[in-house]
Amino acid sequence: MAHQHFFKPLLPGFHASLTIPVAFFLKYIEGRYEQKTAKLRSDASKRTWEVKIDGQRLTDGWKEFAVSHDLRIGDIVVFRQESDLAFHVTLLGPSCCGIQYGSCSVEKNNLGDEKKKVKENPNGEAESSSRDPSCFVANVAPSSLRYDLMRFPRGFVRDNGVVGSGEIVLMNEKGRSWNFNLRQKPSNGTVYVRGGWVSFCDANGLKAGDNYTFKLIKRAGTLVLRLLPNEPKEEANEVSLPEEPESDAERNLEKIQRKEKVKKNVTREAESSSQDPSCFVANVSPSSLRYDTLYLPKRFMRENGVDKRCGEMILINEKGKSWTLDLKVKKSSGTSLIKRGWRSFCSANGLRAGSIITLKLIKKRATLVLRLIPNEPEEANEVVSLSTEQESDEESIHDEKISRRKSLLSENRFVTLTLTPYTIQSSLLNENLLCESMFQRLPVPFTRMNGINEETKMTLLDKHGVKWLTTLRFEDDKRKRLRMVGGWQGFIQANDVKANESIMLELIWEEETSCVLKFCSKVKLEIK
């Protein structure tokens, strides 16, 4: 018999069951076979999975197959009928490229810990260098970018005594650093970092499939891993750190060490702050930029007698330009914060996540005024850092909420939209070409979960790589549901989408307030 095919994109809830397309089911399965069990195999393993066929759905056994192959939302599975109810399954990623599997067998099919054995380095889990235990070489796996995390190889963790708590700093070749919190999976002891890995890869030009090498250059206190330059293949096994690090990297490492001393000696340093209690040092954290909010140290506010003040606060840069922000006090904790303008202030002054700044209170009467002080190594030791106040329990809880939210964002970045007749104006042009005033609603849970609002700049990316600019507007005064206005008509025409068809889109953030909705595939697929 000729090999027949059908393929399905994996949508939320796909673990429970997979629906066989109606046309394929009626033509090649219904009424033809007495048995109700399909046999599935893939190139990733010699094992054959038996999956129950319940009507038009694959049920019992399907979840085991999906988990064993580490299938994710957005992946595409292609079924080729080899004989009777025996199928060969080809597994594709969202980009329609084949998912790469290593030599690891998927025959050990425990649904929990063995899941990650299916793919080689599924989330960027790396391999230690046999010559230098302080180094490891890893591959940027698509899943590590998809879930914004990097796992450390167990050999490297064991040899260097790395634990799943505390902080770690990743430093590139030029000395720029990224801070992460170490985590550990209770079920199997895997140590990993999450949130910020995608930003690190983007900044250093690392893409899916690239290899990279890290070397542990500092063990005491906060761990520091340095990204080593890629070497020719014949030298790839010899991983070594130059005897003298680049000056920028060395200075950055010293900065990290100074920050540690601040954390270890909060009380002693706070006492010496009497030299200049009007100053404090703060860290520009990713969460402060995302939420446009800076928490002010309690000790600083209290010592200057302004811990009860509300209203407005003015920030002035070195050139005298000013920004007016809202000053508020959280009733639950008494923590002071400034918002609505902090992100603009940072952007205008070249401050990015991870930057260290010094602010000085130069006016207490009427509206409070903080001035940005130039960062100089000599002055940095004279101005006592109260950044640990900013990293108070309140901030830690805030960051933990952000971490959980990022995890949810990663899992909910796909959305399915249906081109309903309601969204199409009554006058249709030739062969489903739609009028210019067409719009498309976005699901409320999707926009809320991903922090999309009316100020978000959104672009639509079609299957040909062409971008269509659209505008987000609230549908009514309740300001709940957003609709895309403009660009939608050209976008659906470019993707050949007609009335009552559904498409799956992927959300990709480019900057803090700008994002792209990328066309993945049509949900309802026709058998060719």
UniProtKB/Swiss-Prot annotation:
Its main location: nucleus. Signal peptide: none annotated. It holds the Pfam family B3. GO terms for cellular component: nucleus. One of its GO terms (biological process) is embryo development ending in seed dormancy. Residues 3-95, 135-231, 279-376, 425-522 bind DNA. GO terms for molecular function: sequence-specific DNA binding. The keyword 4Fe-4S does not apply. Disulfide bonds: none annotated. It is found in: Nucleus. Residues 234-253 are annotated as: Disordered. This is Putative B3 domain-containing protein REM15. It comes from Arabidopsis thaliana (Mouse-ear cress). InterPro entries: B3_DNA-bd, DNA-bd_pseudobarrel_sf, REM_fam. Keywords: DNA-binding, Nucleus, Repeat, Transcription, Transcription regulation.
